[in-house]
Every structure is written in structure tokens, then in C-alpha cells.
Amino acid sequence: MFIAMADFKLLLLILILLSLFELDLLHFHHDFFSPFPVKIGLLLISIFFYAYSTTRSKPVYLVDFSCHQPTDSCKISSETFFNMAKGAQLYTEETIQFMTRILNRSGLGDDTYSPRCMLTSPPTPSMYEARHESELVIFGALNSLFKKTGIEPREVGIFIVNCSLFNPNPSLSSMIVNRYKLKTDVKTYNLSGISVDLATNLLKANPNTYAVIVSTENMTLSMYRGNDRSMLVPNCLFRVGGAAVMLSNRSQDRVRSKYELTHIVRTHKGSSDKHYTCAEQKEDSKGIVGVALSKELTVVAGDTLKTNLTALGPLVLPLSEKLRFILFLVKSKLFRLKVSPYVPDFKLCFKHFCIHAGGRALLDAVEKGLGLSEFDLEPSRMTLHRFGNTSSSSLWYELAYVEAKCRVKRGDRVWQLAFGSGFKCNSIVWRALRTIPANESLVGNPWGDSVHKYPVHVT
């Protein structure tokens, strides 16, 4: 286990002070200032600062991140999607009309991406094609990340992969170990949910370490091939994408890192049956597997978000907003007055908003519920339009959009808000450590070739 440079200096100071017990270096006439009491006092002070430095929480830095951009040959327009659906000879005419209405109102553009096997007529999904999709996305994001940071794969001590619907054997993390020939003691994890919290806790237990998070989803084997309407919406919204994020707890990385993690708030409402079953992978009446979305999904998401914000608010809101909340409680609870629901003004504490691009209806609900502006939701809506719903990696496409627009300034706070089945809601707050200049903002950025076209009006 390595010793951080700051801890090493403190340890060295203690050793020097201990040596003073053998060397009579201090000479004072007053008994109070005799060498022995002075040495004891200095030693106790040093021990205190050493204990403080080793027990306090170490900062977690976001060195950089990278999002995968598939090739143009994988682009799928609305017309291509409908031709694919008809060519598959799996869907009834009513189902195709239903998916047409969903896609036309989805907020997706014509430049999103699909697995190559889904663009053939008929589609040819297989385990081989599913692995091919994951390899393209994961290795594409990782290669870009290692190039941007200059960090070698073998320098990374922790790898975490989160992918909900594709869990092959060997695992996706083992695929990374094999591809980059990682060390035998590397720590690897495969998750089906959001993973920044796990990475942060692992970094607390492993000093002087890099941790890489890979967020992706697999579309090849996830496409629903039946006619149950509750399972057809994911077909219309989900697209190929993935991101890789480099985190560090090394103090020397602060200078070059983009962001510092300030807060993580996780909310899990799985104890409620309504929340637990609102997004569920299961078989339809004919035994065809798909992800069924409840009509109450937006309501469930709003309820989970409310619980999450109750915990997040006290951590980030200014004193003025906290006083407003206390006043609201006094009026509504103590005096039983009919008052409008209290909605915190999160624009007072966050400069940039990266809301999970799960769908147009979800973004509309969050925008209205939190009183956000079109500008605040621009990164999320444009990500949905350009890349579709790429699951948890959409948060990173959104942050990449903000950087591509040269909006990130030193000291800005970024709020990433994610939703997941279960039902879960996670808030992640970052503070920008430096201004991202124009000559850096487009390097390895998936928006590099298209950001000048955005924002666009989405009907």
C-alpha cells in the first residue's frame, strides 16, 4: 500500500521530533520552556495533525471522461427504424403505428445509433453480435479516455462496469482485463445500476489509486420482439452509447482534474411494490422477454425525486432557501394554512444541470416540477435528440455537451440527476476545478462534429 505524499511528510516530521528526545537542541532558562516540555508539545501537535490527515475524507477527483461515438454506418433515422420494424416481420400493423406515434413524440432526432445487426433486414441479433456491440462501445470509450488522460490501463487499480440488461460470461469487466492485460490484483466489479458511489467508497479504502467507471447498455439482445404495448416504448427510445470516467484520490491529480466530487445522494424506493414494478424486465403473454414500463412511471419518478431532494437540499441550498423551507413548514404544519408547495430554487446552487435523458415526458416533468428553464434542460434535451436514451451514460453525453459549448467555468457546480429501475434516484454534485478552454473542450468529445448545429427546436 502506497503512502500519499502529504502523509509521508507528516510521518517524517514525527520521526524528526522523536529524534529530539536524544538530541539536546533547545536551551531555555525558564523551566516551562525547558527542552522536554517543548518536545512533548511539538510531538502531540504533530500526532494530532497526522491523525487528522489520515482520518479525514480524501477528495475524489474526476480527471476526465470520454463518451463513445459510433460510426455513421450505425446511424438510424426514423425512416430506417420503421423499415427495420416492418422488415423484421414480428410486429402487427397496429404495433408499427403505435411505435410511429411514440417515436414522433419522443424528442429523438435522425442521427442516433443502433447496433449493426439491427440495421439488416431482417435483424440478426445473437450473442456474438451482442459481444461485438459491447466491445465497440466499451473499448471505444476506454481508448479515448486513456488517450485524453495519458494514463496507462495498468495504472488503474479499480474498474467498475454498469450494464443492466447484458451480463455475459466471462463478464464485461473480465473482457476489459483481457483486452488491456491488466494486473492480477486489479479490483473489478459488474453492476446493473449507477456506480459512482461504489467507486467513491473504494477510493476511500484504497489510497493513491485510479478508478475507472464504464457506463453502458446493450441493445442487441434487449430489443423487444413482441406486440405488448407496455414493452414497446424502450424499442423507440433506447440507443447505442457508453461512457468511461477516470476518478482519482491522488492529491497530485488535483491540478489537472476537471472536477471534484462534493456530494452523492442515493434514494432507493424498492420497498414499495408500485415503485419496484414500474420498470420491470419480464415475459409477455407469449413468453417474449422485454422491459415493461408502467403508466405511472412519471409519477413514481417524481415521488422518488422528491425524497432524493429532501436529502440533497440541506447539503447544497443557501441559507435563504433553508429559511423559506422552515417558513413553509411553520405555515403548513403548525398553523395548518393552505400554502403552495415549497419548491427549492436549485438554480441558486447549481450552474449546470445534467438530467437523465430517459424520455421527453420525464424531462418535461422535471423541468416543470423544479421550475427550470429551457436553457437549464438544453443539455438533456439535445442529448436525447442527438444520441437517444443511452441509459446512465446519458449524463456524460450531457456534460460533454456543456463542455463543448465552453460553458464550464472554474467554481461552477454541476448537478447530475439519474433515475433507474428499482426504483432509484441518484444525485451527484461536482465542482469545476478549472475553466475548460475551447481548445480542450472538443478533444475526444462526441459533440465535436455537431455541436455547432445545436440547440435545435424539438417538436
UniProtKB/Swiss-Prot annotation:
Look up the record and name the pathway of this protein. Lipid metabolism; fatty acid biosynthesis
Q: Which GO terms describe its biological process?
A: fatty acid biosynthetic process
InterPro entries in the record? 3-ktacl-CoA_syn, ACP_syn_III_C, FAE1_typ3_polyketide_synth, Thiolase-like
Give residue ranges for domain FAE.
Answer: 52-334
- Signal sequence extent: 1-25
The name this protein carries in UniProt is: Probable 3-ketoacyl-CoA synthase 14
Kindly state which keywords UniProt assigns to this record, in alphabetical order.
Answer: Acyltransferase, Membrane, Signal, Transferase, Transmembrane, Transmembrane helix
Its placement in the membrane is given as: Single-pass membrane protein
GO CC terms of this entry:
membrane
| One term of GO molecular function | fatty acid elongase activity
Similarity comment text for this entry: Belongs to the thiolase-like superfamily. Chalcone/stilbene synthases family.
